[in-house]
Amino acid sequence: MPKRTDIKSILILGAGPIVIGQACEFDYSGAQACKALREEGYRVILVNSNPATIMTDPEMADATYIEPIHWEVVRKIIEKERPDAVLPTMGGQTALNCALELERQGVLEEFGVTMIGATADAIDKAEDRRRFDVAMKKIGLETARSGIAHTMEEALAVAADVGFPCIIRPSFTMGGSGGGIAYNREEFEEICARGLDLSPTKELLIDESLIGWKEYEMEVVRDKNDNCIIVCSIENFDAMGIHTGDSITVAPAQTLTDKEYQIMRNASMAVLREIGVETGGSNVQFAVNPKNGRLIVIEMNPRVSRSSALASKATGFPIAKVAAKLAVGYTLDELMNDITGGRTPASFEPSIDYVVTKIPRFNFEKFAGANDRLTTQMKSVGEVMAIGRTQQESLQKALRGLEVGATGFDPKVSLDDPEALTKIRRELKDAGADRIWYIADAFRAGLSVDGVFNLTNIDRWFLVQIEELVRLEEKVAEVGITGLNADFLRQLKRKGFADARLAKLAGVREAEIRKLRDQYDLHPVYKRVDTCAAEFATDTAYMYSTYEEECEANPSTDREKIMVLGGGPNRIGQGIEFDYCCVHASLALREDGYETIMVNCNPETVSTDYDTSDRLYFEPVTLEDVLEIVRIEKPKGVIVQYGGQTPLKLARALEAAGVPVIGTSPDAIDRAEDRERFQHAVERLKLKQPANATVTAIEMAVEKAKEIGYPLVVRPSYVLGGRAMEIVYDEADLRRYFQTAVSVSNDAPVLLDHFLDDAVEVDVDAICDGEMVLIGGIMEHIEQAGVHSGDSACSLPAYTLSQEIQDVMRQQVQKLAFELQVRGLMNVQFAVKNNEVYLIEVNPRAARTVPFVSKATGVPLAKVAARVMAGKSLAEQGVTKEVIPPYYSVKEVVLPFNKFPGVDPLLGPEMRSTGEVMGVGRTFAEAFAKAQLGSNSTMKKHGRALLSVREGDKERVVDLAAKLLKQGFELDATHGTAIVLGEAGINPRLVNKVHEGRPHIQDRIKNGEYTYIINTTSGRRAIEDSRVIRRSALQYKVHYDTTLNGGFATAMALNADATEKVISVQEMHAQIK
């Protein structure tokens, strides 16, 4: 049956900001859906509040709304655009929940919109625990013994039946938010209280514990004629008890017998039929008891998921694209497989002749005080995928692609340590982010495979693989470099050992191993991901490396090529914004006739889609892997400035190896990053900087600090996302920093800067081609200096800065660009205090604000800069004037503190946000209000506000209090703040701080008395004292600000209506022309 003709226009719901549990895999699926449906001639309307996505580019849909994914806003869009259908399966849990809400509120019925891809009933049947259990029993499949509770009493009754340990999961939350494992009644009550609060339906599912069972997933696609295919089976390396998003996973499943696989395959198809998914992809999760083979269905997601992005990249089968076409009425046999160039239909089940491993990436070091043990609640922020011909090869490639300082199974503990075994046992039993390395340490320390199995419940087959690698490592260490003959080295390379790891084991430099391989002429070959195990020829160049005989890379020799290095796995500080830039570089250079080559290892992103570039190498972004690809492809230029710190770190070494790095030279990048060299440039240009010093010892720091004056910003040199960066207020604080946060030495200097308190911070993005400088945008931060720029909301155009100040910055940016010989993108950060402009830092690379500026101004900066790097001037491109839009755009960030109870949610110089949203309005207030709604803020228009501010904010707080009163708020204040307000004739109710007696602030927050809290602090002691206010505000969902500027922005936003007017990106950009 060909496509439906009764629908002409389709609304696609996006996933919104990136949060833990819902990352850029939904940009990948949404972008594919837009392409697939427009190919078929439908008018596509898209809503997504996240500006850092490819899917919100104006070319991707006919009407694109960067608006909050909130049912009232979406209703306005439906009313204006009148779509015939809505597709909710491409935007994760956010889109499903929004679609169900639109259905519940009667919006779909009111405007005659049909839901395609999944029916409201199928979504509800899969997501509602009780209905799901009944459905599974009906088809003869078991689910875990469980019960449902809506109150604490009901929960305790269920626990009595299920027993401890038990697993608690709230309904309709994502990434296991609010769930956990309870081993006793006390833990049980704590987890249930949190879960009831987080579940939108106030519903908990309490399950018997399946801890230690094996976990599997099936990616299934079904069409309306009941054609069903399994795209991929996935096995979790980690046993049940760890969220699948935090588990190492392997595809295809490795430890199932064929009979077990067939049973699971049939069961997963039966699940889709029973739930009623008949147009698209779903993921079904199973648990198997290794003791007796009992099979249980855990859950199913009736939508495209994180696993389906992985399955798509692992097999080359584009699940999201196929699902979008099935949603409009096609069947699988009518669709052709792109990768084989249409030689096979989409109803062919993919078969693969390689092994894929995914390892999650964690960021616990950003959250002091967080519980870093892995549970049923997802905590990872990104993932890496690797492809190899064996389990060992793909696992070792994934370890080095993860970029956590490991080149393979580097040891975590020294075996001389008397506590070594105790530590290893603890890490194996109670898994943290590094367990995989501790497993190797366990074998080094003499544990047997059975010993490790008893502690981890990881299948012995996987453990034997790791044990063998450890034994090989011991042999390399024993024979040294002289013992590495051609056969032995080939055997090691086939098992995935990195040159760098072998060098460490043999006690030589990495370059010597590379030289040895050159002598033996030992290089990897490249195989293709082709969905059909090489049965048919493929036109698509999607490659992975391995050490075998036949190379399938087949590089062209007649075209000029440019290679883009991607950013590797997502992490805080280096996320989707950098992937966005890489994709734009590839698209722009393709349009200009270059052959583009992408190198990356992140399965969630658009950059690793096989049709984003001409050739895709799915490889770790390390020196060894990149040099081997350069050797075979011989590109004219390589772009390292777009993928964040990952490729930048390789710039010098690549250049030294003769690789043509284009754009700003590695030397110029170093001049901006190296403190002393940068200082010389600044002095030559006579620009102002805050007083600063570079120190290499503690006593030296104490001396310099006296000259500069406190407070200080301290940080190690060369970091992204503000790692180990703090504000210190006095000498004792400075000494504490050196003892706990960093080790300082001649090789690792620490930078001290005078901290400009209360300054306004400004970000400027620009492009330089050597002849002229184009200002992309000037963004004024809402939080004052001292909050990491990646965690601060910002406005474009600036909302308080004078024209003169902005012109001073424009001139300074231009001078810096020429001085540093920038070719391509650059980002400059300034601070403005008492009408003076201070230069904070310069980054001659793509910054995380590039996508936001591009959406706000309509100038695709990353594309323009990529063309500049390839030698096309700004004048030739006709892009020479700065665009200042006639409307305001505000970027707001999304923070993951709800996943890390116990962490202080105070914003500071260390970046901790995972994602961003954008709001657009005619006034700053309207734009800010929309950004707040988009970031799921709990802002209320009135009620009771609590004010507790530091000494330096007391003058300005009076004005803020007056604004809140005018808005209809009642006011409470702590002692010091109340005195200042009283003197100004405002009489708030006085409240006790926690140590002043009860009822105190925390009691009042718990009782739900406040709708808004503003709490600003300075000094270590005050920060510690007031931490309980911020934690409680977060826990009880009270909107709070930790800076006075944030408070003023909030007060302005209270007057605006965020749901009143919607505007598409296309309409915005038309106003600029």
UniProtKB/Swiss-Prot annotation:
Name of protein: Carbamoyl phosphate synthase large chain
EC number(s) recorded for this UniProt protein: 6.3.4.16, 6.3.5.5
Amino-acid positions noted as binding Mg(2+) 1 in the UniProt annotation, renumbered to this chain: Q285, E299
Subunit structure: Composed of two chains; the small (or glutamine) chain promotes the hydrolysis of glutamine to ammonia, which is used by the large (or ammonia) chain to synthesize carbamoyl phosphate. Tetramer of heterodimers (alpha,beta)4.
Binding site for Mg(2+) 2: E299, N301
Record's keyword terms, sorted: Amino-acid biosynthesis, Arginine biosynthesis, ATP-binding, Ligase, Magnesium, Manganese, Metal-binding, Nucleotide-binding, Pyrimidine biosynthesis, Repeat
Positions that bind Mn(2+) 4: E841, N843
Entry domain remark: The large subunit is composed of 2 ATP-grasp domains that are involved in binding the 2 ATP molecules needed for carbamoyl phosphate synthesis. The N-terminal ATP-grasp domain (referred to as the carboxyphosphate synthetic component) catalyzes the ATP-dependent phosphorylation of hydrogencarbonate to carboxyphosphate and the subsequent nucleophilic attack by ammonia to form a carbamate intermediate.
Annotated residues for binding of Mn(2+) 3: Q829, E841
Binding site for ATP 2: R715, H754, L756, E761, G786, V787, H788, S789, Q829, E841
Residues reported to bind Mg(2+) 3: Q829, E841
